[in-house]
């Protein structure tokens, strides 16, 4: 399992577009962040061999996990599943469609009142089926946090939607810091 945690800097607001590793249009800021950790991922993946990979991320980490999953599948030809929680939209429709066809499962969990999955706006779109975790309708920053009882909602999602993570070997964590612009 590769877990990419959230992180926030002013460069997260950079919403230009660029081409991803699969030559589709994606958010430039997310792609720049992914590019900054790609060499670390390559070292890790070279050690794992041909074992399946689960890419997991929350918030911005979900966007980076999305880009990582596509890159891993394209370059390592191993089964990859993607699990995101409260992730923003990553790319245009062509990117989302290619992501859906190349990965071995996309599980995109959102809290109904979390504003992060609503950005960036069109023409960015999500890949994969959405799993809503609450019936709340108010927009609050607290809806986006993965702490306390809200974390329980995410755990419920993994346990009861048939997405148990069976992992052999060590669980690896990859965190990142974006380079300043």
Where are these regions (language model features)?
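Non-catalytic, mobile gating and regulatory segments of ester bond hydrolases
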Residues: 1-56, 60-181
